[in-house]
Regions:
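HTH-adjacent hinge/linker in prokaryotic transcriptional regulators
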Residues: 31, 35, 40-85
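Extreme N-terminal segment that seeds HTH/winged-HTH DNA-binding domains in transcriptional regulators
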Residues: 1-30
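NAD(P)-binding Rossmann-fold cofactor-contacting core
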Residues: 106-127
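N-terminal Rossmann-fold NAD(P) dinucleotide-binding loop
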Residues: 95
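Glycine-rich Rossmann-fold phosphate-binding loop(s) that bind the pyrophosphate
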Residues: 91-92
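Phosphate-bearing ligand-interacting subdomains
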Residues: 17, 22-25, 129-213
Length: 213
């Protein structure tokens, strides 16, 4: 199921909604209201309702949203019917954490390969994911129909790795280095800079600290 021109931020929130809904479902609830979802994610109920209207879903005024139904709908929108395969490039602490944390979290996303240059990591298996030498990247990506790459290498190596991923046929990249990347328009790029995020938190923490003195 594909909805044209769905805003990037809405897609991001849909993923968060599904995670929240799965948690609520585990508590044996069958329905939920927008204000309950909003409270869990620290956003407004209006935002929740707007996002769900964009995907054509509305709840019952008395009972709220059917949790299982909404989880299934979000899955049809976000997930690929055939599933997608993911590779991590850079098997340091962050790369290993990705593999370990992600294991079994989503049935439609499979972490199936890792790449590194460290001989102590190559030809080993980490949490079920085999690690290959970086020189094997084009071959393994194409052979296993991998469409998503996660970059967790030292920042100076990121542009070269991104280029190799693009040339190998990758369609989406998650860049976890502070180095901005340039990729073709047909490759979706998501960049996450932990330093920037921490500085943002520090700014607002300082602001709150000053406000309540």
């Amino acid at each position: 199921m594909f909805i044209k021109n769905l805003p990037h931020k809405t897609v991001e929130r849909l993923s968060q909604y599904r995670r929240a809904l799965l948690l609520i479902l585990s508590k044996e609830k069958t329905h939920v209201f927008s204000h309950e979802i909003a409270q869990m994610l620290h956003i407004t109920p209006v935002q929740v309702r707007r996002d769900l209207m964009l995907i054509g879903y509305s709840g019952n005024l008395r009972k709220g949203y059917d949790i299982k139904e909404l989880i299934d709908l979000i899955g049809k929108i976000i997930d690929s019917e055939r599933g997608q395969r993911v590779a991590v490039v850079g098997l340091g602490n962050l790369g290993k954490a990705f593999i370990s944390y992600f294991k079994g979290k989503r049935s439609k996303l499979s972490m199936i390969a890792a790449f590194d240059v460290n001989p102590e990591k190559i030809n080993r298996v980490f949490d079920g994911v085999p690690c290959y030498h970086i020189n094997q990247l084009p071959e393994i990506i194409k052979q296993n129909n991998i469409s998503i790459g996660i970059i967790t290498v030292p920042s100076e190596q990121a542009p070269e790795i991104a280029e190799a991923l693009v040339l190998s046929g990758i369609k989406g990249i998650l860049n976890y280095t502070p180095k901005p990347l340039n990729v073709p328009a047909y490759v979706y790029l998501e960049e996450y800079d932990m330093i920037t995020s921490l500085e943002k938190v520090a700014f607002f923490a300082k602001k709150n600290d000053e406000r309540f003195k």
